[in-house]
Amino acid sequence: MNALIDNRVLALAGVVQALQQVRQIAETGQSETSAVRTAINSVLRIDAESPEAVYGRIRDLTQGLQLLHDYFGNQLRDQLLPRLALAVLQLERRFIRDTSIVAAVSAGITQAAHQVEQTGDSAHPEVLSTLGALYANTISHLRPRIIVQGNPHYLGQAGVVAEIRAMLLAALRSAVLWRQLNGNLLDFMLAKRAMAAATERALR
C-alpha cells in the first residue's frame, strides 16, 4: 500500500511542480529551466506508466514534493496553486474520455519529440511553442477551462503564453499518471495523513 501511495505522491508532485512554473511565469515572465525540462520530458514520455519512467530521478521533483509537504502541513502560502491543481485533476477526467482530443494530443507530442531531437533541448522555445499551440487547439476547448492569473504585461506576450500552456499540458500529463495509479480526489480527505507521510519519505 505504501508503494502505491508513494507513486501517487510523485505524480501529484509532477502536477504541482508544473503548475508552480505556470504561476511563476505568469507573474514574472521567467521560468526555471530545470523544472521546465522535467515537465516537458514527462510529456514526451507519453507511454511511460510509472513515476520513475516518466520523471527519471525523484530529486528532479523536489520542488513539487516540497510544495505538497507544505500543503499537507497547512503551510502553503500560494492559495491559488491548490485551486489550479484541483482544476487540472478535474480536467483530466474530461480529457481522457474524449478520444479524438487524446489522439490529437498524442500526434502533437510526437511532433514535439521530433523537434527535441533536432534542437537537442526539451526546453527550446520552438518545442514550447509547439506544445503550447497543441494545448490551445485541443485541451483548452474542454471544461473546466483553466484560468491563469498573473501580470498582464507578461500574459500579453506570445512566448510567455506558449510556455504557460506547455506547462499546463505537463500538469495534465502528470494528472493522467496519477489517475492511472488509482488516484482519487478522496485521497485529499481520507488519505491525507498517508500522503503527507509519503511526501516526507520522498524528500529524504
From Swiss-Prot:
Keywords: Cell inner membrane, Cell membrane, Cytoplasm, Membrane. It comes from the Bacteria. Gene3D superfamilies: HflD-like (1.10.3890.10). It is found in: Cytoplasm; Cell inner membrane. GO terms for cellular component: cytoplasm; plasma membrane. It is a peripheral membrane protein. Belongs to the HflD family. NCBIfam families: PRK00218.1-2, PRK00218.1-6. This is High frequency lysogenization protein HflD homolog. It comes from Xylella fastidiosa (strain 9a5c). The lineage of its organism: Bacteria, Pseudomonadati, Pseudomonadota, Gammaproteobacteria, Lysobacterales. The gene is hflD.
